[in-house]
């Protein structure tokens, strides 16, 4: 019998396997598709590769602004996809080598939980003192909306071999705005349809409104607070009807309405595991109601992020090894949307902080006062939220490259830093990171390149 049998080789599963192996535990890692899961093959990595290609396209267009003679002459999707697949391939090869170098039994095939301590794959049974469920997620659709032909999810959109003339995107969350950003840079006429009142609705309202202004400026059309009714496709394109009666027409429809847990027909319910709408329920130590069965990643309710999966996988390995690791604060997990402009945040929004703490202070530092942001030609801001006379409880940013600032932001939040403590740290000039220091100087009552 093995110490751990892990079902699923995505971010959560393989992180658990690697850490458990480091700790001297015997590990079986089972994956039906490719090691690395959604993030590496159909999510984070390929989308960010497309977003970088989009940034290069925009740079070519804007060269004259900097005195550089450059023009944008179109997109060759076969070369874009070759670049994207090359990035994936190199990372995949590296990950395979990493798993192979550890004492991990890697099993290819579709596994099913057949007992509280056993998974069956290809007719073979693997028993473990502990089971870790890490089967990930799939791209959702809406009832009655079949994914076929010109109606697609991110899975199909990532392998498109042409640039559509126009696209409708159903969903204005992270996936929707990232694809809107890529396609607009590639020259596509894009319309985003979002049922909630704002784009990126999970973000602080100030950030959502700034994103909407930026999208208007980029020529990305969007409709918020409107509901989808139906879609019909023909040889030329897709017609989308909204509940308001308005119809939209485009070459294709991207359904970006979130991701669902991949837990059907895997034996979870049959073994008595508590579920809710397909998600596996756990306590704060990621243990299910069945002894010695744990769950990590997208099947656990909460943020569906690869780095959350990594951390949960490491946590469970250490928990099983008896190290009693510190529980994970979900609010302290950084969130980044890699559109143009980028959005990055951690902690509570202003509205959430008011609800939780009552009295708060907030401050927005405009990137207009930041030298490096002026050099890059970006606009945006860093918004800080603090408890009244207390630590910083939220950092919310929008602007080019602000995702690179989230590292310091997550230290500030997770170490419960006061604005005055961050203000005393010296930030290099001229960097965008300097804006983080300036924001904290201002919030602690001693603004430098900012109005109080």
Where are these regions (language model features)?
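Glycine-rich flavin
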Residues: 2, 18-25, 30-164, 191, ...
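Flexible, glycine-rich terminal cap/loop adjacent to redox cofactors
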Residues: 7-10, 16-33, 38, 45, ...
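A conserved FAD-binding loop/helix module that cradles the flavin
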Residues: 203, 207-210, 296-352, 429, ...
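Gly/Ala-rich phosphate-binding loop of Rossmann-like dinucleotide-binding domains
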Residues: 17, 21, 180, 184-185
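N-terminal Rossmann-fold NAD(P) dinucleotide-binding loop
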Residues: 13, 176-177
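FAD-site-proximal beta/loop scaffold in flavoenzymes
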Residues: 148-164, 247-322
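Short hydrophobic core segments
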Residues: 5-7, 111, 126-136, 169-170, ...
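Beta1/beta-strand and adjacent pyrophosphate-binding region of the FAD-binding site
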Residues: 1-10, 163-173
